């Protein structure tokens, strides 16, 4: 039977299969017809034809083809029945969707009928259908239906042609094999597993529009569990059953239509059954969907607007799916359980009850009669450790949230309840997540509306702004959890001592509140934060602190990652901006949480150690610690004394204090300013224990190269110390060797001793994790470096292709120079696209231009590399403006990816 008559649409009808030439005897001209169908659908899609019509029309066209071929192979003269199953059974086919069919027989096929079936199947392949086919008896179905995937396919079986008496068999098999609760439990387990494979979030950078949370599968799941009980054929049938409201149905259909349009464009764009919205496709799909990019817009405005609508759509589907599947359980499964198996019910107050681990309104009119109960409910959840809300209450909440207006926001009781919610830390992330999903947060804080689904088209910002803010608040909770104590020991101890945690929670909410408005979001957010806090009765001091945290929430991370925090002047300047220890403690906690909630893959122990170092150094200054050094010479003396104390505890016959001090006198002041005592200790041991290196005056000595695990880093992070005669191409050849061995540089400290020996320290990320465990890998790296140092010719660079993901981003190369009077060096700040061999290519340019590198700070933020180099000419002289401009031009030319 047809879903609809394809001739009534814009789709070309199936030609007469009996009127074909000899040359077409196998494919009957059908491949050309299938191509025409896809062209018709593409044209109709461009014209804005209702996507639902196109989905159903393609299924109807395939229906007509299969029916005619079934007849052509004389299968209508048998007891067989032909069913469409799966998505095709629902009557939903995108251009390259799977065409799954079931040929059902009452009994085992005879040889003659089996031969006809084989011919039918072969014909389908010949014409280009590539179907998924199952040929089964009723008994076969009963056996395989114990598999939930097979059972789901059978549940959606739709008879196309054949033995009409078999039409109800697939559905009956499912009913017979699976109880209502078993089927529900299996589908929920399946959904949880699917979501887990996609990071359990709707906000993946490259979402699978079918299987990710909030994808088409979540809508299908609603249909599957309800079809098992109600035996419906379409979702709208749930409305008369009072399971689904008209508005909920409309919301689901709108969201489904949006995803179908994306899926159709994806299939047309890729020419295959592609459901992953990769970066490669997002710009093209945005354009095809009508998202325009004007010259006045930001470079990524169109694609960001498109993805914002996708994320909002996914959140809507996910919210409805969670609510409706829970509603199914509560009303159709739990309600039928014996009293002893139902969740225990208790009274919280006159307005709310506790039902197991859920909260529920006491009667239908709670929110209408007591508007403050909207916020009271969330406070009760925190106070009583309740994580979930009953679905009847959620539906009432969704309606009530629409009534939150300016009058509601101005009510002093409501303001108090909102702040009380932020003070109550128990389940705060979960409570705010529900507030967001059901409209409470956006209606109470109108600024939040624009943040929902707002994304930044890059690899650094892993989540949408609204998701990021809530994840930041979840990170704050983790700082107090024993489970994460080892990961966040220092920040956790600080956060636990902060009594008024709502200060940081409010800073978390407001730190990105102004994104997407244009202008400096930190400054705009500061004004919003102060206004909100004062309007909610908070003190001026609290409001200013929250405003300050909002404005300067990036200060600490940028200082730690992009400046040389071994320079006392850098730390002192930062300390002056921070002002006091209270500001520092709050900023440190907020910054660590912010970085983790931005992109957990970019948070590593190296960044953690930078943050810790900046915090501890700044805290000493702000506390006016009498034992803390106050100038360069005092810092040098303190560092040397601490390192010497460590060395005195080392039992090593190759070292004595006189040897150590003699060596140190040759290393220069800069070394003791930039290295920590522990590093100086192991460097000194390495140098004095490896003759004939001994002293910098030994001109013929072999280079010393020592590797070890970084004490504050994960196992795949490696420290490498290089002590050798300085030479013009040292940085360039070192970077080239690291690149050849696929080692990423996290940090570089490049120091020249007073007698022209280099003391270079690098922190490397070993992608393969073999440097510390495999002696051959260590020997190979050491050998390559020594060979490169001995052969001063231009290092050979390895040509590498730009990774797929990076091809979709445009990061213009920008270079700024500042002269540092104290060090008499130029500080070169470079921003460019992170790309294979980046540092090696920069090093080669430095070599060719006669540039000496004294220090480097390497920072990678998603697809962006933001690096700093302290440079001079080979003679340590100031570079001329002309040379700086030539260096800038050359680097931009070298680092701009070719098309």
From Swiss-Prot:
Name the domain of life.
Answer: Bacteria
Tell me which residues make up the HD domain: 465-581
Biological process GO annotation list? regulation of nitrogen utilization
Q: Which cofactor does it need?
A: Mg(2+)
| Statement: the UniProt record of this protein carries the keyword Repeat | yes
Show the SUPFAM superfamilies listed in the entry.
ACT-like, HD-domain/PDEase-like, Nucleotidyltransferase, Nucleotidyltransferase substrate binding subunit/domain
Keyword Magnesium on entry: yes
Q: Cite the entry's keywords alphabetically.
A: Hydrolase, Magnesium, Multifunctional enzyme, Nucleotidyltransferase, Repeat, Transferase
Q: What does this protein do?
A: Modifies, by uridylylation and deuridylylation, the PII regulatory proteins (GlnB and homologs), in response to the nitrogen status of the cell that GlnD senses through the glutamine level. Under low glutamine levels, catalyzes the conversion of the PII proteins and UTP to PII-UMP and PPi, while under higher glutamine levels, GlnD hydrolyzes PII-UMP to PII and UMP (deuridylylation). Thus, controls uridylylation state and activity of the PII proteins, and plays an important role in the regulation of nitrogen assimilation and metabolism.
The text of the family note is:
Belongs to the GlnD family.
Free-text note on domains in this protein's UniProt record: Has four distinct domains: an N-terminal nucleotidyltransferase (NT) domain responsible for UTase activity, a central HD domain that encodes UR activity, and two C-terminal ACT domains that seem to have a role in glutamine sensing.
Q: Could you tell me which PANTHER family the record lists for this protein?
A: BIFUNCTIONAL URIDYLYLTRANSFERASE/URIDYLYL-REMOVING ENZYME, BIFUNCTIONAL URIDYLYLTRANSFERASE_URIDYLYL-REMOVING ENZYME
Would you tell me the protein name for this molecule? Bifunctional uridylyltransferase/uridylyl-removing enzyme
Species name: Psychrobacter sp. (strain PRwf-1)
Please spell out the taxonomic lineage of the organism that makes this protein.
Bacteria, Pseudomonadati, Pseudomonadota, Gammaproteobacteria, Moraxellales
Gene of this entry: glnD
């Amino acid at each position: 039977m047809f879903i609809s008559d394809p001739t009534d649409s814009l789709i070309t009808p199936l030609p007469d299969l009996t009127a074909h030439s000899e040359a077409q005897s196998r494919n009957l001209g059908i491949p050309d017809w299938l191509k025409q169908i896809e062209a018709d659908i593409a044209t109709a899609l461009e014209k804005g034809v209702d996507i639902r019509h196109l989905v159903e029309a393609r299924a109807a066209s395939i229906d007509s083809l299969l029916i005619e071929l079934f007849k052509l192979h004389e299968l209508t003269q048998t007891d067989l029945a032909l069913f469409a199953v799966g998505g095709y059974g629902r009557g939903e086919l995108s251009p390259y969707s799977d065409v799954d069919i079931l040929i059902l027989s009452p009994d085992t096929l005879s040889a003659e009928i089996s031969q006809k079936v084989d011919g039918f199947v072969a014909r389908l392949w010949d014409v280009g259908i590539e179907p998924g086919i199952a040929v089964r008896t009723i008994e076969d179905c009963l056996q395989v239906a114990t598999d939930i995937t097979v059972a789901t396919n059978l549940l959606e079986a739709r008879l196309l042609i054949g033995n009409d008496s078999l039409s109800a068999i697939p559905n009956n098999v499912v009913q017979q094999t699976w109880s209502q609760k078993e089927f529900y439990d299996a589908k929920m387990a399946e959904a949880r597993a699917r979501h887990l494979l996609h990071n359990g979030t709707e906000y993946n950078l490259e979402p699978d529009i079918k299987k990710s949370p909030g994808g088409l599968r979540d809508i299908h799941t609603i249909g599957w569990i309800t079809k098992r009980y109600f035996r419906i054929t379409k979702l709208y049938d749930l409305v008369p059953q009072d399971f689904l409201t008209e508005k909920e149905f409309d919301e689901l259909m709108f969201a489904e239509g949006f995803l179908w349009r994306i899926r159709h464009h994806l299939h047309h764009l890729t020419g295959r059954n592609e459901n992953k919205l990769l970066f490669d496709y997002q710009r093209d799909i945005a354009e095809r969907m009508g998202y325009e990019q004007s010259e006045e817009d930001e470079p990524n405005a169109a694609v960001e607007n498109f993805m914002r609508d996708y994320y909002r759509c996914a959140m809507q589907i996910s919210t409805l799916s969670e609510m409706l599947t829970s509603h199914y359980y509560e009303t159709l499964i739990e309600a039928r359980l014996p009293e002893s198996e139902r969740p225990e019910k208790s009274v919280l107050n006159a307005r709310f009850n506790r039902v197991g681990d859920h909260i529920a309104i006491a009667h239908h009119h709670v929110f209408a009669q007591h508007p403050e109960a909207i916020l009271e409910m969330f406070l009760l959840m925190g106070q009583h450790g309740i994580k979930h809300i009953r679905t009847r209450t959620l539906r009432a909440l969704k309606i009530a949230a629409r009534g939150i207006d300016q009058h509601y926001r101005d009510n002093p009781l409501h303001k108090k309840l909102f702040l009380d919610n932020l003070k109550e830390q128990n389940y705060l992330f979960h409570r705010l997540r529900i507030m967001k999903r059901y409209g409470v947060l956006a209606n109470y804080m109108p600024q939040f509306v624009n943040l929902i689904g707002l994304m930044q088209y890059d690899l650094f910002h892993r989540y949408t702004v609204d998701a990021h803010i809530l994840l930041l608040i979840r990170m704050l909770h983790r700082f107090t959890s024993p489970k994460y104590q080892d990961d966040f020991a220092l920040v956790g101890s600080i956060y636990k001592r902060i009594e008024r945690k709502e200060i940081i929670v409010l800073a978390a909410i407001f730190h990105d509140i102004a994104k997407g408005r244009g202008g400096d979001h930190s400054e705009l957010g500061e004004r919003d934060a102060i206004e909100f806090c004062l309007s909610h009765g908070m003190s001026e001091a609290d409001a200013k602190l929250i405003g300050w945290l909002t404005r300067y929430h990036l200060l600490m991370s940028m200082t730690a990652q992009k400046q040389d925090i071994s320079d006392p002047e850098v730390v002192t300047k930062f300390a002056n901006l921070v002002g006091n220890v209270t500001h520092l403690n709050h900023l440190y906690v907020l910054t660590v949480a912010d970085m983790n909630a931005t992109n957990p893959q970019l948070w590593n122990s190296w960044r953690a150690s930078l943050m810790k170092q900046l915090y501890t150094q700044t805290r000493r200054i702000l506390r006016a610690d009498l034992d803390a050094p106050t100038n360069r010479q005092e810092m040098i003396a303190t560092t040397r004394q601490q390192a010497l104390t460590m060395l005195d505890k080392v039992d090593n016959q190759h070292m004595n204090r006189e040897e150590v001090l003699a060596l140190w006198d040759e290393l220069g002041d800069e070394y003791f300013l930039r290295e920590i005592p522990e590093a100086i200790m192991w460097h000194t041991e390495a140098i004095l224990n490896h003759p004939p290196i001994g002293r910098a005056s030994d001109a013929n000595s072999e280079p010393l190269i020592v590797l070890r695990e970084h004490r504050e880093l994960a196992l795949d992070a490696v420290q490498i110390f290089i002590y050798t005669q300085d030479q013009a191409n040292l940085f360039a050849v070192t970077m080239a060797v690291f690149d050849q061995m696929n080692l990423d540089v996290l940090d570089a400290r490049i120091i020249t001793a007073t007698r022209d020996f280099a003391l270079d320290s690098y922190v490397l990320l070993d992608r393969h994790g073999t440097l510390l465990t495999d002696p051959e890998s260590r020997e190979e790296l050491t050998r390559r470096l020594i060979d490169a140092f001995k052969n001063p010719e231009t290092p050979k660079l390895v040509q590498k292709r730009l990774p797929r993901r990076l091809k979709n981003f445009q990061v213009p190369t920008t270079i700024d120079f500042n002269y540092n009077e104290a060090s008499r060096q130029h500080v070169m700040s470079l921003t460019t696209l992170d790309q294979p061999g980046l540092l090696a290519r920069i090093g080669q340019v430095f070599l060719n231009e006669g540039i000496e590198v004294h220090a480097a700070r390497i920072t990678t933020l998603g697809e962006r590399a933001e690096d700093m180099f302290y440079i001079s000419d080979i003679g340590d002289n100031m570079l001329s403006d002309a040379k700086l401009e030539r260096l800038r031009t050359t680097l931009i030319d070298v680092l701009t990816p070719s098309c």
